[in-house]
């Protein structure tokens, strides 16, 4: 009898613990994505609102269930996203190609997705009396130093045959610089900023105009999702990358479809400085989305990105944004490069698996 009871208890115990490995297998790994308010990056906040994903830890949307990962969204201002990524406080972050280089020196990084490129979204705005770039030699030009603002300014000077040393680019937060110009504060006759500050300044102060902008350097400022190699190497790291990419393209389908376009733009606008649909239509003209897998693959597998990165790296080294020349790699081969452009995740999402 005791033997029968012992066997019974043993059987019950084995039945109970047999479920533990199954539960462990079902535990979904959590990966974090840091994002800030910007047209193409706000897509992830909108995806949460649309319930395509659930940005809360421990909650899953259909795309997360599809790929078997839990995407935790961490919204912060842009500078904080850069710091968080460099400090390993997130697995991936929405960063530009330029701003991915410095953290990549300490944390090998992979560009998994291009989201957009500036096509007028970064601009030098001046008062009506300034009509020629040479007039800026006598003025301070305010903008955020060592960012895409200074890059836009310097590259346009180069294209116009001007010397950077002849001009005064003065470090200032773009929001503060835009506000000072809008309020007609003395000395603020030229600023370099990005949207929404560009549109806000032009709308609020009618005696200003764009002297030059990022349309002259098409494709050089690339907005991306950058992921750490150490996160990719974790179990389900590739699935997380694919889930992020899948999410972005699903939102773009809503932006592109006539029946859902306006609502999607309004949702983006609410996540991006509370702009209305008409303003957002202008914004997405000036911020060209890489809205399909084919568009993303064309960039990541083409020669243009290599030429662009040569220019960006040179600028970053010359302006001491990076302490040394970062190694840039292309393709799916694992490396310890500061930044590697890898198309394999887009390819996987495009294939539907």
Question: Model regions: which residues?
Answer:
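Sec/Tat signal peptide C-region and signal peptidase I cleavage site
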Residues: 18-24
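Pocket-lining segment of extracytoplasmic ligand-binding domains
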Residues: 169-170, 175-274
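Conserved C-terminal helix/tail region of periplasmic/extracytoplasmic solute-binding proteins
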Residues: 309-353
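Short, glycine-/small- and polar/acidic-enriched structural segments
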Residues: 25-174, 185-195, 211-213, 219
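Secondary-structure end/capping motifs
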Residues: 233-323
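Solvent-exposed, polar/charged alpha-helical surfaces in well-ordered, non-transmembrane soluble domains
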Residues: 42, 46, 83, 87, ...
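Bacterial N-terminal signal peptides that target proteins for export
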Residues: 1-9
């Amino acid at each position: 009898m005791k033997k029968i009871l012992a066997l019974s208890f043993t059987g019950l115990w084995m039945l109970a613990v047999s479920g533990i490995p199954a539960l462990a297998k079902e535990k979904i790994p959590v990966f974090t994505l840091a994002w800030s308010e910007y047209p193409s990056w706000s897509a992830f906040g909108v995806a949460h609102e649309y319930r395509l994903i659930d940005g809360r830890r421990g909650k899953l949307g259909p795309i997360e269930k599809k790929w078997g990962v839990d995407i935790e969204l961490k919204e912060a201002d842009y500078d904080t996203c850069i710091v968080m990524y460099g400090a390993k406080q997130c697995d991936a972050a929405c960063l530009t190609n330029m701003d991915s280089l410095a953290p990549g020196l300490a944390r090998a990084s992979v560009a998994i997705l291009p989201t957009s490129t500036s096509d007028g979204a970064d601009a030098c705005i001046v008062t009506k009396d300034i009509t020629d770039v040479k007039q800026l030699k006598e003025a301070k030009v305010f903008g955020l130093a060592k960012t895409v603002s200074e890059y836009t300014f310097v590259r346009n000077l180069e294209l116009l045959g001007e010397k950077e040393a002849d001009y005064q680019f003065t470090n200032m937060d773009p929001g503060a610089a835009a506000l000072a110009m809008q309020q007609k504060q003395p000395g603020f006759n030229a600023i370099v900023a990005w949207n929404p500050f560009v549109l806000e300044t032009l709308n609020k102060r009618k005696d200003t105009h764009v002297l030059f902008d990022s349309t002259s350097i098409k494709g050089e400022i690339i907005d991306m999702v950058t992921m750490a190699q150490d996160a990719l190497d974790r179990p389900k790291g590739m699935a997380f990358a694919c889930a992020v990419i899948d999410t972005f393209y699903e939102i773009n389908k809503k932006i592109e479809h006539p029946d859902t376009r306006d609502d999607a733009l309004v949702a983006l606008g609410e996540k991006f400085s509370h702009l209305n649909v008409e303003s957002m239509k202008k914004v997405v003209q000036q911020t060209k989305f890489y809205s399909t897998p084919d568009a993303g693959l064309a960039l990541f597998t083409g020669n243009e990105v290599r030429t662009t990165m040569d220019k960006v790296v040179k600028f970053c080294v010359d302006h001491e944004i990076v302490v040394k020349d970062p190694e840039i790699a292309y393709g799916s081969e694992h490396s310890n490069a500061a930044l590697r452009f890898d198309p394999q995740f887009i390819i996987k999402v495009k294939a539907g698996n």
